[in-house]
Curated annotation (Swiss-Prot):
This is Aromatase. One of its GO terms (biological process) is lipid metabolic process. It is found in: Membrane. The keyword Transcription does not apply. Signal peptide: none annotated. Expressed in ovary. It is also found in the brain, but not in the spleen, head kidney, kidney or liver. Pfam families: p450.
Length: 511
């Protein structure tokens, strides 16, 4: 067993700097230094108190030692300092595929063994997520919306509205909307091109996806770029406050910036929802209801509150721009790093689609592209873990898990398992044969799986098919996924300026 001094040094190693970057956003100027010291002192006090009442029996699950309450302090500090995703990978690497740690003094199990992950995903007793209640209240997610709503009855009710919008007729019109929006933004490419001919690819993808989300779920005029700024600030606030201790929210100066970021987006969404409400009141007839329409009618019938309607629409609009846009960016980078795969996909596009536009009828025949998307999600995912809480006692792989235990499903690490022929390489050979669900879970499964998993695949196919049919995209010289700085907190985020991640667009000539 390691000495305490070694554990402290490991916990304070600058392996990652998510927390340094997030801390700099909590406050500005002279306040930042004060906050750093105050946060450390408050965390020390919290863990000292937790050590006093924590049960004395030790868990049989492997993990760092308790050390009279110092272990939970160091464990929690690592999650805040390096980010949830980075810390989860560290502990799985160090202690194995089932690990016990502590977050905010609460016992937390990190799972990367496929059988254990699959067990948690399919059981209804793990439909709840964990996170700071005060932090979720700060950003409007506590018992609202769908993503971190832990009021299970209300979550089930709002999920039906999401499911309706993301399947059936909504899914059928996705391809046409994606193709038209991508083409429209490509036609205005000069607006995102600098003097050297480099295109701001991330802004192109984000603007396109916000437009697609608006056309599918809200359908009101909006300013994409202004909304994107607010969405990015909201996301930063979300991942910063998610696992902060509740008592820190007694000090307004510690979370004021994040509260204001959430308020800005909520205010913008309130204006958009009112535009939608007014349009519905003035419409002579409603031939084609959408997600926002159904929610507003539910509010009118007393089924949902105005706050919940607004949060649901907010989450539907923000869900894709910051995850799908980065996923597509990673895919474009992987294509240039694997030119033989790019040639296979282009050949398939020419054969299946040719000079036509992508449609529902031909999209399903893009088999190589689907394998490429799956392999990209396996090899370099944007979101590589999910958070749950046990609502009942259970046994996982022989280990006792008590009610209230936090669970982190490290699916990104699970996807590097021995089932795949080349688990640590990017290779389409990994999907040459059918992969059972228990080994590949990019969108989860079971009662709390991603409700948009089917539409996400359709959107990515349609956008990629349109982009690759018109242009060849080349990153700046020497840029690869390995040398681009990233953080991994709530999801993998690019830690470089958009201007440093531009690409050259060259019109494509078909063979």
């Amino acid at each position: 067993m390691k000495h305490l001094e070694e554990i402290v040094m490991e916990a304070l190693m600058p392996a990652s700097r998510n927390a340094t970057q997030t801390a700099g956003r909590v406050v500005s100027g002279a306040t930042a230094a004060l906050l750093s010291g105050a946060t450390a002192a408050l965390l020390l006090l919290l863990c000292a108190l937790l050590a006093a009442w924590s049960r004395s029996d030790k868990s049989s699950v492997p993990g760092p030692p308790f050390y009279m309450g110092i272990g939970p302090l160091l464990s929690y500090f690592r999650f805040i300092w390096t980010g949830i995703g980075t810390a989860s990978n560290y502990y799985n690497e160090r202690y194995g595929d089932i690990v016990r740690v502590w977050i905010n003094g609460e016992e937390t199990i990190i799972l990367s063994r496929s059988s254990a992950v699959y067990q948690v995903l399919r059981k209804p007793q793990y439909t709840s997520r964990f996170g700071s209640k005060q932090g979720l209240r700060c950003i409007g997610m506590h018992e609202r919306g769908i993503i971190f709503n832990n009021n299970i009855e209300l979550w089930k009710k709002v999920r039906t509205y999401f499911a309706k919008a993301l399947t059936g007729p909504g899914l059928q019109r996705t391809v046409a909307i994606c193709v038209a929006s991508t083409d429209s933004h490509l036609d205005q490419l000069e607006e995102l091109t600098d003097l050297s001919g480099q295109v701001d690819i991330l802004n192109l993808l984000r603007c396109t996806i916000v437009d697609i989300s608006n056309q599918m779920f809200l359908r009101v005029p909006l300013n994409e770029k202004e909304l994107l700024v607010k969405i990015q600030k909201y996301f930063e606030a979300w991942q910063t406050v998610l696992i902060r201790p509740d008592f820190l929210f007694k000090f307004e100066w510690m979370y004021k910036e994040h509260k204001e970021a959430a308020h800005e987006l909520h205010e913008a969404m309130e204006i958009l929802v009112e535009k939608k409400r007014k349009a519905l009141e003035e419409a002579e007839k409603l031939d084609d209801a959408d997600f926002a329409t159904d929610l507003i009618f539910a509010q009118n019938h007393g089924e949902l509150s105005a706050e919940n309607v607004q949060q649901c629409i907010l989450e539907m609009i923000i869900a894709a721009p910051d995850t799908m846009s980065i996923s597509l960016f990673f895919m474009l980078m992987l294509l240039k790093q694997n030119p033989e795969v790019e040639q296979e996909i282009l050949k398939e596009l020419d054969t299946v689609i040719g000079d036509k536009k992508a449609e529902n009828s031909n999209l399903q025949h893009l088999i190589i592209m689907e394998s490429f998307i799956n392999e990209s999600l396996r090899y370099h995912p944007v979101v590589d873990f999910t958070m749950r809480k046990s609502l009942e006692d259970d046994v996982i792989e022989g280990y006792k898990v008590f009610k209230g235990t936090n669970i982190i499903l490290n699916v990104g690490r699970m996807h590097k398992c021995e089932f795949f022929s080349k688990p640590n390489e990017f290779s389409l050979e990994n999907f040459e044969k059918t992969v059972p669900n228990r080994f590949f879970q990019p969108f989860g499964s079971g009662p709390r799986s991603c409700v948009g998993k089917h539409i996400s695949m359709v959107m990515m196919k349609a956008i990629l098919a349109t982009l690759l049919s018109r242009y060849t995209m080349c990153p700046r010289d020497g840029r690869t996924l390995n040398n681009i700085r990233k953080t991994n907190n709530l999801s993998q985020q690019l830690a470089e300026k958009d201007s440093e991640l531009t690409m050259m667009f060259t019109p494509r000539r078909r063979q």
